[in-house]
Amino acid sequence: MVNTDYFFSSLRHSGVELFTGVPGSLLKDICAYITDNTSPDNHIISANEGSAISIGIGHHLATNKVPLVYLQNSGLGNVINPLLSLADPDVYSVPMLLLVGWRGEPNIKDEPQHLKQGKVTTDLLDAIKIPYEVLSPEMSSEDAGEVAKKMVERAFTLN
């Protein structure tokens, strides 16, 4: 299982300072850890996912740093407009790291309302050309930390 402290430290060592998003049940541990270990100026709980993306964009434009935006996969529909009309490499080329809680993941028992969104999550990310890595519960903390580092580096090279 991924150690929250190690994963958070990996993000910090990769230069992530701002954390913003909409908490979800699958991300409750990392969200609680962020709240306990980040100043209120660097952890902004957003009213919706699109606003969180916009906050991340503003942070990057002001600091040239990569923000982390967290959300549940049901919020992906809310992030499409600001991602494609502002953050996209063809527009303002704003790098950011998305941490998406995957409800309705195929072959994992979940509530009926999450099943369709879960089925199309990776297809949706592929359609809008968002590269992703899946963090599994079996993944070691070290491997998850390496994924975080790699994704922050990738965010800069894509933009």
What residue spans do the PLM features occupy?
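Thiamine diphosphate
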Residues: 1-157
